[in-house]
Amino acid sequence: MTLRVTNTLTGEKEPFEPRDPDSVLLYYCGLTTSDPPHLGHARGWVHVDVMARWLDYLGYDVHHVENLTDVNEKIVARVGEDGDSEADVARHYVQQAIDDMRSLNLGRAEVYPRVSEHVPEIIDLVERLIEQGHAYEQNGSVYFDVTSFEDYGKLSNQSVDDIESQGADTEGEKRHPADFALWKAGGVDPADIAEHQHPEAAPAEEACQTAQIWDSPWGEGRPGWHIECSAMSMTHLDESIDIHVGGQDLVFPHHENEVAQSEAATGKQFANYWLHVRLLETEEEKMSSSLGNYFTVADAVEEFGPDVLRTFLLSTAYTSRATYSDETIAEAKERWDRLSRGYERAVEACDDVDAHTKVTDETLRDAVEDARSAFEAALNDDFNTREAMTALLDLTAAVNTHVDGHDEYDYQGLRRAVETFEEFGGGILGLAFGDDDSGDVSLAGDVVDLVLTVRQQEREAGNYERADELRDELEALGVEVQDTDDGPTYRL
């Protein structure tokens, strides 16, 4: 069965056909590192994790990139509360995000690029747009001219005339109200962070003095929001990719503007498939940091554990409405208890019987193969994790029926059931069945980070030969190291 996905660009569920039949380029718009990650972020993380795992299962070489936005006015608003500068606050929440991802048993993306590490690439992309007549400079800021891109609005299904404005234009710098900033002159204005500040934060003027700024052909300034993802996706994947995933709230303006600036610069379709994860809701509204109605990932993992949370988040398809409540989390706990107990009973029954037993239960064996087929059909149907979970629950019921109804067990049938729990429940859904190795991948990433820290210390101490040796040893293990002005990055 061919994988089909719901493509926001076309509004249709359509067959997935990658540019390269052997590989998939997947980009996920990650979070802004200004607050503790919450369950709304976790919903996106876990669904993209399953997408990547399933594409890998289908035989593709998956190149998965997920950005972490570490330059933003909301981050500046937290100065004095979670760090002494914008960069400090960002580092604090970047680390928390990585820790939270690990706690949810996420497979590691190939790279987690930060905006602060890609300013030269951003400037290069802005210059290309100016040279091609798609952008213009005004008083040190650079804006994208939406009227220069004929297909503007194709992702969100609206026209330029439908859009009244994008961002403030107090200086009257824009040619069209819908034009958006690619580069912002100067630093951060205290007025821009006032609504995001907490009482514990530093005074606005003091916080803004810590904001990161960079030199550019147009003077000192900061990147615009939308240009960042285009530059990072092109840097780490290609000018045209297969799948771009993000939250439903990003369709407009963020993803619409990504399409416009990327395709205007390259003349190529930026992403062939746009997949959008519906937001997690609580009491009829989205869960978000700005609304203050969120449950942090760290608190949720501590209270419920990663398997209950993954079960909760995957019990609803990524395109469907999902609601957090005491009732829905209790349902997830009951569902996980059934799944884990079914797996344990299958393992225990296998241990109690001779592998060469002649007992055959065709009902069990048929149920196992039916569950496998149903699971595969579900994931091939737009990564439908709800139906995939149902297939595993049906498998659990079949195992219970067999164990409860027989004095002698069908070893081969039970062994196949155990393999299915581990391969599909563990390897694809990321639940704790058997030996899922994604935790090993996360640990490997932590070890690489540690080695790079030591290598950077050696370089700063002038021990360049030893630093080069560490780099060579990493590359011999398949870790590509790239040195940038903001420190080393790597990809596995």
Curated annotation (Swiss-Prot):
**Location of the protein in the cell:** Cytoplasm
Keywords of the record, alphabetical order, are: Aminoacyl-tRNA synthetase, ATP-binding, Cytoplasm, Ligase, Metal-binding, Nucleotide-binding, Protein biosynthesis, Zinc
Single GO MF annotation = ATP binding
Per the Swiss-Prot or TrEMBL annotation, the motif 'HIGH' region is positioned at 31-41
Matches recorded under Pfam families:
CysS_C, DALR_2, tRNA-synt_1e
Q: What residue stretch is flagged as signal peptide?
A: none
One of the protein's GO biological processes: cysteinyl-tRNA aminoacylation
Give me the reactions it catalyses.
Answer: tRNA(Cys) + L-cysteine + ATP = L-cysteinyl-tRNA(Cys) + AMP + diphosphate
- InterPro entries per record: Cys-tRNA-ligase, Cys-tRNA-synt_Ia_DALR, Cys-tRNA/MSH_ligase, CysS_C, Rossmann-like_a/b/a_fold, tRNA-synt_1_cat_dom, tRNAsynth_Ia_anticodon-bd
Source taxon at top rank? Archaea
Q: Which is one Gene Ontology cellular component term of this protein?
A: cytoplasm
Cofactor(s) demanded: Zn(2+)
Top EC class for this record: ligase
Q: What is its main location?
A: cytoplasm
Listed EC numbers: 6.1.1.16
Question: Which residues participate in Zn(2+) binding?
Answer: C29, C229, H254, E258
Q: Which family does it belong to?
A: Belongs to the class-I aminoacyl-tRNA synthetase family.
Quote the protein name from its UniProt record.
Answer: Cysteine--tRNA ligase
